[in-house]
Amino acid sequence: MTMIEPEVIEAARRVGAARELPPEVLLAVSLVETNAVAHARVGGRREPLIRFEGHYFDRRLDGEGRERARAAGLASPSAGAVANPASQAARWALLGRAAAIDTEAAYASVSWGLGQVMGAHWQRLGFASARALAAHARSGADGQLDLCARFLLAEDLADRLVAKDFAGFARRYNGSNYRANRYDEKIEAAWRRADALLDASPVAPGAALGRGARGQAVFDLQEALAEAGHGLSVDGVFGHGTEAALRAFQERRGLAPSGIADAATLAALDGGRAGSCG
């Protein structure tokens, strides 16, 4: 079994906290789509994993551009007719050839990063262009997982995973043929592995904490909230109760009630605990 880089696990926690998603959701999708591999070495650079879809490219071209792309084997009206090379370096070279014909159409025809989100979704995910979406993916694991989070939220898919409706998620994410791909089984197994990875990987000291975080840092946060007079379970799992208590604390202290234990909130909690000592 491939080892998962701590960078990806921490990115899932950060993005999950920022987007109010359990990090298991982001990790599970990444495990199925890219084995949670955030980067490949391409020409000495760290680049996100990509997959080029020639039928998307074909639809986004017309006239001479489409003729050139088809003649070069870069575009086809049929899905799967343009094969993806095995290596990421070769895929990036293919993308470069497509971009020489039409950069925006080429970037819209690629699935990007850990969650393999299509560049074609750039507008509904809040980007100015497909190139801007690609730049977000190329910024690092956080950017890639943020793309995944935006897509899951836009499609109302995250709740299906949280509810462990793996078949319902697979149908929406992978298509009606999901059983042939065993996508429901894959995402269920990935969910269990993501859960175990988060349990086994401690939260980095000083990291922001949000829904889905767990471990000693969450336990300490819950104890501090309890000492501050907020009723909640002290169990090391950041769920609805912890979020509600944290929002109440933030409102009381004049902080933005985000429900995320950021640096300012943690400092306020630490200050309150220090002030309570005799």
Q: For each of these PLM feature ranges, what is it?
A:
Residues 163, 209-219, 223-271:
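Short acidic, glycine/serine/threonine-rich helix-capping segments at coil-helix boundaries
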